[in-house]
């Protein structure tokens, strides 16, 4: 593994994680007592006598990487280092890097946007799946849904509006039949572009998003199966709508790493 200036020492990384998980003082994850004793790299609660570590009650409990290698992978993922580049940096296999990138993606917070004012809506096709995506014009707010199959109908479009578009909004789409008469099903002011007539003004932003997604996924992941489309679209949309979460590994961990509830 390469040694890079942006990768902190193991001691510093442990300090970051301890502060994120426990705050100023380490406490027992079970009884919350602060009478804990440190024994090498683990802690022992004087009250309930359980042993624990910095990561034992988090989603990193099974981590077998060194702290610095873990930080390098997380840093690579936050700045969108492609899989193959991350393999060279870390010395890990393709499968290992993909597993860690998947884990980081899985722990992104939930994000739900209700689009309003002017909403551009379109669909794109990926082998045996369809992606319906809406964008609030002039903003970073996206809403999306992945459907199995390549034949979406009006029911799918209307269901999308029910859950993701505010009543009274302006809806701009292409001339697809699934949008015809849609304002009778949900209160929107609907306008259409007919692409055969070279009309693109109403859907330019959302169609551009599909192009950006395809470029991003090929560059960062090289390839992915359509069955995993939803996972990658979620990451892409999160990066677009909430780029601040990816400012640094430390900021990402501060929003995603915490003690898991104990029954």
Region annotations inferred by a language model:
Residues 1-263:
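Residue-level recognition of single "structural anchor" positions
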């Amino acid at each position: 593994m390469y040694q890079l200036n942006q990768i902190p020492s193991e001691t510093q990384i442990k300090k970051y994680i301890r502060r994120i998980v426990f705050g100023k003082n380490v406490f027992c994850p079970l009884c919350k007592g602060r009478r804990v004793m440190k024994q090498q790299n683990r802690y022992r609660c004087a009250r309930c006598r359980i042993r624990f570590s910095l990561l034992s009650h988090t989603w990193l409990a099974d981590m077998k990487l060194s702290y610095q290698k873990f930080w390098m992978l997380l840093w690579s993922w936050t700045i969108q280092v492609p899989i193959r580049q991350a393999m060279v940096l870390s010395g890990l296999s393709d499968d290992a890097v993909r597993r860690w990138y998947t884990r980081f993606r899985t722990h992104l917070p939930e994000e739900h946007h209700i689009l309003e004012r002017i909403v551009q809506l379109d669909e794109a096709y990926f082998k045996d799946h369809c992606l319906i995506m809406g964008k609030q014009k002039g903003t970073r707010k996206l809403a999306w849904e992945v459907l199995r199959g390549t034949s979406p109908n009006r029911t799918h479009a209307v269901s999308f509006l029910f859950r993701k578009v505010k009543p009274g909004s302006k809806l701009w789409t292409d001339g697809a039949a699934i949008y015809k008469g849609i304002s009778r099903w949900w209160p929107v002011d609907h306008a259409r572009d007919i692409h055969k007539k070279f009309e693109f003004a109403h859907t330019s932003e959302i169609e551009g998003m599909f192009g950006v997604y395809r470029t991003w996924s090929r560059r960062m992941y090289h390839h992915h199966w359509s069955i995993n489309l939803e996972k990658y679209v979620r990451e892409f949309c999160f990066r677009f709508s909430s780029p601040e979460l990816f400012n640094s590994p430390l900021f990402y961990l501060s929003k995603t790493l915490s003690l898991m509830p104990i029954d």
